[in-house]
């Protein structure tokens, strides 16, 4: 299974001339410009509430600054605010991008409902 090496950059390249995605592309570029900044600072700057675009921007920053599921989700939770929607997005992204095996087994084992379909 070979997917895209960098889905975020692929999205930007594929949709750069589509007006429908103009606002999304602007936000992605804003987040990419903040890649070297601490995650909690970026979340505070972009918005800690569940509303768009802050939740999208915070989740995207965790994605582009993390190498794996665990580090991205932990970073998202530690940033505070309404982190549930961000953590859901980040977890779904990494599970889809890196595969189900990217989810830490110890997390799965501690979550009763997940045992029935992930182990």
Q: Model segments located where?
A:
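Accessory "access/gating" subregions that flank catalytic or transport cores
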Residues: 1-80
